Curated annotation (Swiss-Prot):
Quaternary organization: Interacts with GvpE.
Family annotation (SUPFAM superfamilies): P-loop containing nucleoside triphosphate hydrolases
Biased composition (Basic and acidic residues): 386-396
Predominant place of localization: cytoplasm
Induction: Transcribed divergently from the gvpA gene. Maximally transcribed in late log phase, probably part of a gvpD1-gvpE1 operon. Gas vesicles appear earlier when grown in static culture, possibly due to O(2)-limitation.
Phylogenetic classification of the source organism: Archaea, Methanobacteriati, Methanobacteriota, Stenosarchaea group, Halobacteria
Gene knockout outcome: Partially gas vesicle-deficient. A double gvpD1-gvpE1 deletion is partially gas vesicle-deficient, still transcribes gvpA1.
Compartment(s) where it occurs, according to its Swiss-Prot or TrEMBL record: Cytoplasm
Protein name: Protein GvpD1
Ranges of biased composition (kind: Polar residues): 363-372
Task performed by this protein: Causes a decrease in the amount of GvpE protein. The 5'-region of its promoter or mRNA has a repressive function on downstream genes. Gas vesicles are hollow, gas filled proteinaceous nanostructures found in several microbial planktonic microorganisms. They allow positioning of halobacteria at the optimal depth for growth in the poorly aerated, shallow brine pools of their habitat.
């Protein structure tokens, strides 16, 4: 049987992987491995086991052994529509332990603890590679133990199974009914624990803990997962685009706004919000600790693109610690430079030197939110210059609007909202009013409250009223330690939080209340597509 490389388990490239990479590597070992699957009832152990069998079925014969109910019922409850396995892969010991999909000559009539190992050996002899799961192992042990006057304890039988698995190169999965550590963990080669809990607002949070995987380096022990659509799926780390010069080859297909709503630019989020953000509303995007410095862009960039693609004005005050050139490079990749120059207004302020430990970002690398792509150091960032001879070199007049995002050129009649390197409220409002006069459409304001704290600390209420009056949309960005965080929440119509869960990124709404949503970013196309998967 030809098989794919299990080190790279199947994924749909949207931040969801069907089986953890570490577990695929664990089962690739030369010797048979025994995995203990811990978890309280209702944590998703059976769906996890079925997912594992589904993946391992690609290069082995698999068998799911249970004492639950009959084959048809088990298949209908857990396998149908969620697995490629049919009823022949399911064995109910309560019925006939010898009704196997393989041609096996079993030299005994009754299955008990003494004959269990021989039974497994006979099945293995009829296959090239066997994977067998016992769900649950305690119930199967108890069912077979009652056939003995003085049965060996479960620890002894488990040890015999693990030894047999190593000798015969059999993959074993033993499902238990407890999350508490047990003596069995010292016998087996690998241990995972499935956990589920609810937060104070009733949202379900599920995590897979990789306790032990012999021979495998575990970089991230805690991995969030979901049982959405009745399937076990791991929510994986997502990658941000490497900061680079835009090519202009992408095409952003805008999502339509309605009379009452602005599209978020993310189809899944529009669906959750019944069409998007309300017109005239203030949205608070609350960033949790330990996120990368460009995490703010995950939700804001799609909305910015959607406004600009419909030739609607956008004013952005980005975080001071964001990657230089992020907006310019991203937007010029998916929109024409004329659209960016005409409708996008970026106001960056002077941050000055800082050695603060309370930053968005972690040390740079190239992998994910937790390991960001290397960006241009501040000293090497492009400086603002005036356009000369109409040259289209990406440098435009900033007239006090400083920074490397090469903002919209300031009209001679427009007064810069930057005073002494800092954003000022009245000049900002005067500036957007002049922008508004050039268009009949509402504006999008994207404002980092850390950057704009001095300008907005006494005017947030006034600004929220202004936004409502003009049917604009505002995204206020705060992070841990932002002084205006609580005040931003008070004036906001919606409140969303972005936080880390293991190495993955989770989004959820406080107002409106939403489930936890795993974020996936597909980079298989020229424009990244963001997907949201509900954690259930």
């Amino acid at each position: 049987m030809s098989s794919p490389n299990l080190a790279h388990p199947p994924t749909d490239y949207t931040g969801i992987v069907l089986f953890p990479r570490e577990l695929s590597q664990f089962f690739m070992g030369d010797a048979g491995e025994t995995l203990l699957i811990n978890g309280a009832p209702g944590t998703g152990k059976t769906l996890f086991t079925i997912r594992g069998l589904d993946v391992l079925d690609r290069d082995s014969d698999v068998l799911y052994v249970s004492t639950r109910v009959d084959q048809e019922t088990v298949h209908e409850m857990y396998f149908a529509d969620h697995s490629s396995l049919d009823t022949t892969a399911i064995l109910d010991l309560f019925q006939d332990p010898f009704e196997l999909p393989l041609d096996v000559d079993v030299p005994f009539e009754k299955l008990d603890l003494d004959s269990l190992l021989e039974w497994i050996q006979e099945i293995n002899a009829a296959t090239t590679q066997l994977t067998i799961a016992f769900d649950s192992w305690e119930l199967i042990y108890e069912y077979l133990a009652v056939r003995h006057d003085d049965p060996p304890d479960i620890k002894t039988v488990t040890n015999q199974l693990a030894v047999l698995a190593r000798e015969e190169n059999i993959r074993l999965m033993l499902v238990t009914e407890t999350a508490a550590p047990s003596s069995l963990e010292y016998i087996v080669d690998g241990v995972v624990t499935l956990q589920v809990k609810e937060d104070d607002r009733g949202r379900t949070r599920r995590d897979l803990r990789l306790d032990k995987l012999r021979g495998v380096r575990i970089g991230n022990r805690l991995q969030p997962f979901t049982l959405a659509d009745g399937q076990f799926q791991v929510i994986t780390p997502v990658e941000l685009l490497t900061i680079q010069t835009g090519t202009g080859n992408g095409t952003w297909d805008p999502l339509a706004n309605s009379k009452a709503k602005f599209s978020t630019g993310i189809r899944d989020l529009d669906r959750i919000l019944s069409g998007g953000y309300n017109r005239g509303s203030v949205v608070h995007l609350d960033l949790g600790p330990d996120l990368s410095r460009d995490a703010w862009s995950v939700l804001t960039l799609p909305t910015i693109r959607n406004f600009l693609s419909q030739e609607m004005g956008v004013a952005v005050v980005p975080p001071r610690e964001g990657s230089p050139g992020l907006l310019h490079n991203d937007l010029n990749t998916v929109l024409s430079s004329q659209v960016f120059d005409t409708y996008c207004h970026v106001f960056e302020t002077y941050a000055g030197p800082s050695d603060s430990a309370d930053r968005y970002d972690q040390p740079d690398s190239t992998e994910s939110f937790s390991e960001m792509a290397t960006t241009t150091p501040p000293d090497d960032a492009p400086t603002a210059t005036h356009e000369t001879d109409g040259a289209d070199d990406g440098s435009r007049s900033t007239d006090g609007v400083t920074g490397s995002d090469q903002p919209h050129p300031i009209d001679e009649d427009f007064e810069s909202p930057i005073e002494g390197g800092q954003l000022a409220y009245e000049p900002y409002m005067a500036y957007v009013e002049q922008v508004r006069e050039e268009s009949e459409d509402p504006l999008l304001h994207v404002i980092s409250m850390d950057t704009a704290q001095e300008a907005f600390e006494t005017r947030l209420g006034d600004f929220a009223n202004y936004v409502a009056l003009h049917n604009d949309l505002t995204l206020l960005i705060t992070k841990q330690g932002t002084e205006l965080r609580t005040r931003a929440d008070r004036v906001a119509d919606m409140h969303f939080r972005l936080e880390r869960s293991g190495d993955a990124i989770i989004l959820y709404g406080e107002n409106p209340l939403t489930p936890l949503l795993g974020i996936g970013i597909s980079q298989s196309e020229s424009i990244p597509k963001i997907t949201l998967t509900e954690m259930v």
